[in-house]
Amino acid sequence: RRQRQMCIRDSNVAAKEYFASQISKNPKGKRINDYILNRGISAEVIKEFEIGFAPEGWTNLFDYFTNSNKKEFINDEVGLFKKSEKNKVYDGFRNRIIFPIKSKKGHVIGFGGRVIDEEMPKYLNSPENEVFKKGKELYGLHEVLKNNRSLKKVIVVEGYTDVLSLFSKNIKYAVATLGIATSKNHLEKLFSHVDEVIFCFDGDEAGMKAAESAMKICLPIIRDGKSLKFLFLPNNEDPSSLLEKEGKEEFEKRIESSRVLSDYLFELVLNKYDDSIENKAAASKEFMSLISSMPGSNYKNILIQEFSKKVDIKLEEEVKVISKRKQIKVSEEKEFDYELDK
């Protein structure tokens, strides 16, 4: 297994070097470099993140490995190549800007590719293998840790270019998920390094849904001393466009004024209901359902107290009832296990 993992990593390093060389060698690669620079991403950041280019054509990387005595890297496990119906091998990444994805320690474990023409899917990631699991990795985390000796917070943005734009403006604490929703693994990894995680979303309906999903995933692992915040951008804006319009200082003000979890949670629930007794009861039920996944903590107790004030209902008794139900359930499960053992 160790040998397979080393082969995958070595293959990725060789591919990364090839893709990086095409930015300067390939005529279209030079145009791609200009395209990236025009989006406000600095040459220094392009170099630090080792951005590359996969040229047009079906076998550029395949031919490079073949002609460079690197045939051992042409295998199914790595995920750099695909096979046609006629069993012919061709490049998986073609005519795309290439973003090497690195582990926390800096090993290249996969790639993200952004299409230039809109005929193909916009983003393409390496398939998962022994060293690359999308639900566990975060783009930019290696660079964030490398650039910050005393890291206090991390902002999670939506895409690779958002991370690069923020780094280019010296906001070097940005990461992105790999084209998937935030997972429990992502959050646990971030909270192992920082006490404050800020999610940055578009202000549209999709962004609101993504924020709610992230919150629900976070609730079971939030604990005293850890903070979750939400930053919603104006419609039709992303970090790159806002940085261009407002500059670093104003964007960091937005980060500082992000909504804390308690405010976001209360607003999410209460905005669905009016002030009638029936709806206050319904809001309380939804709120208790949401926080039921949270571990016991001072923070959870304070959330309950503050929400109780907002709906003018004492929820402490409800908490005791829920807690008692859980104890009974655990007790019954233990009794059932005992009966099975007999």
Language-model features, listed with the residues they occupy:
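Short, small-residue-biased leader/transition segments that mark boundaries at the very start
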Residues: Q3-I8
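Amphipathic alpha-helical interaction segments
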Residues: D10, A14, R31-Y35, N60, ...
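Non-catalytic interaction/clamp surfaces of large macromolecular machines
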Residues: S11-K47
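Extended, non-catalytic structural segments that build the interaction scaffolds
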Residues: V13-S24, W58, L151, F287-P295
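Phosphate-handling DNA/RNA-contact segment within nucleic-acid enzymes
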Residues: A14-A15, G57-H193, A210-A211
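Short, well-structured beta-strand/strand-turn elements
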Residues: R39-A54, N170-I180
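Short, surface-exposed acidic
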Residues: G40-I51, N69-E77, K83-K86, K310-V321
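A charged alpha-helical hairpin associated with nucleic-acid processing machineries
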Residues: S103-K104, L145-K153, S183-V197, G203-K342
